[in-house]
């Protein structure tokens, strides 16, 4: 599939939308190499997806004994980026920033096997490049309504009183309020009558090591009739996703580039499908990239002025997991 500029992507998406032509799309975090193609051509271009049960391939889990080892970056390396972020937070240039790094992993799974075996509502495998098994919606659109479900806050479900711990944690509360406020503001740029329909509800996610709890909220807005005609503009206006950048978005994104020292690429970008009537899309988190023969699991977390470097480093590593169907 040919990569395009963001302007070409917007024009192509608007064109497909006007024609009500189903299409697949993938946009990287930096908005430098967006991909778009008619849905019917996606598989022959090495793109395989399973998005809320809509898929262009046969999902065939082949249970294998799991051999999955993390090779974490040194804490001192993480601390360098964390200190830079804290300096910017102290100056007031950001008040929430999502800091991410890759962790090298080794195991007996290929990208294809991970795609088939993981359990997630939004899955994508781009041949020889990456696999993504995301729990997080970006936006879903149907019946002229647009929905987003920002996800912020996680805890190990096996901890005593885990749900109450998560819901009453002040740092998690502050982060979640910030992201909900940011996403309300984002939706107001493309829609009207914005409402928070559900605030900080709990999702339970299975992993190969047990269960984790995550908090999300549901935000809703009303789009104009024939929103399909501006589908490219709507997506571009909302990028990057607030939950994986921070607030304020533009300045925070600049700080992210300084702290992480490498481009994220398709990690923390978005992907999705337009089926001719509705749109479903996801934030590309829970993401494993392949570079030559090496595999990297990309993860991160929200940093505020109250964050502790050791805690955040451990959270980054805690998120390096595979949500395997049937795990205890």
Curated annotation (Swiss-Prot):
Domain of life of the source: Bacteria
Lineage: Bacteria, Pseudomonadati, Pseudomonadota, Gammaproteobacteria, Pasteurellales
Similarity section: To the C-terminal of para-aminobenzoate synthase component I.
Protein name in UniProt: Uncharacterized PabA-like protein HI_1170
InterPro entries: ADC_synthase, Anth_synth_I-like, Chorismate_C
Single GO term (MF): 4-amino-4-deoxychorismate synthase activity
GO annotation terms (biological process): L-tryptophan biosynthetic process
């Amino acid at each position: 599939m040919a990569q395009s500029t963001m302007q070409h992507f917007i024009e192509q998406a608007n064109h497909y939308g006007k024609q009500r032509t189903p299409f697949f799309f993938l946009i990287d975090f930096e908005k430098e190499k967006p991909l778009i193609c008619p849905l019917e051509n996606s598989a022959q271009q090495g793109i395989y997806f399973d998005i809320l049960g809509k898929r262009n391939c046969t999902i065939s889990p082949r249970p294998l004994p799991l051999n999955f080892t993390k090779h974490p970056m040194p804490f001192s390396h993480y601390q360098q980026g964390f200190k830079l972020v804290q300096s910017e937070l102290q100056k007031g240039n950001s008040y929430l920033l999502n800091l991410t790094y890759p962790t090298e992993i080794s195991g007996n799974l290929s990208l294809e096997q991970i795609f088939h075996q993981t359990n997630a509502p939004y899955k994508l495998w781009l041949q020889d490049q990456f696999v993504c098994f995301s729990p997080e919606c970006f936006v879903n659109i149907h019946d002229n309504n647009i929905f987003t479900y920002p996800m912020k806050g996680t805890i190990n479900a096996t901890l005593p009183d885990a749900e109450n711990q998560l819901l009453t944690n002040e740092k998690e509360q502050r982060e979640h309020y910030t992201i909900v406020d940011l996403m309300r503001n984002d939706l107001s740029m493309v829609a009207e009558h914005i409402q928070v329909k559900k605030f900080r509800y709990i999702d339970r996610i299975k992993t190969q090591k047990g269960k984790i709890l995550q908090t999300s909220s549901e935000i809703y807005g009303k789009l104009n009739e024939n929103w399909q005609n501006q589908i490219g503009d709507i997506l571009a206006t909302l990028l990057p996703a607030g939950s994986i950048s921070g607030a304020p978005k533009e300045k925070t994104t600049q700080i992210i580039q300084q702290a992480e020292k490498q481009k994220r690429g398709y990690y923390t970008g978005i992907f999705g499908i337009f089926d001719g009537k509705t749109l479903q899309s996801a934030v590309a988190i829970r993401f494993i990239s392949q570079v030559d023969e090496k595999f990297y699991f990309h993860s991160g977390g929200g940093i505020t002025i109250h964050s502790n470097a050791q805690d955040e480093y451990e959270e980054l590593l805690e998120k390096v997991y595979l949500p395997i169907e049937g795990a205890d």
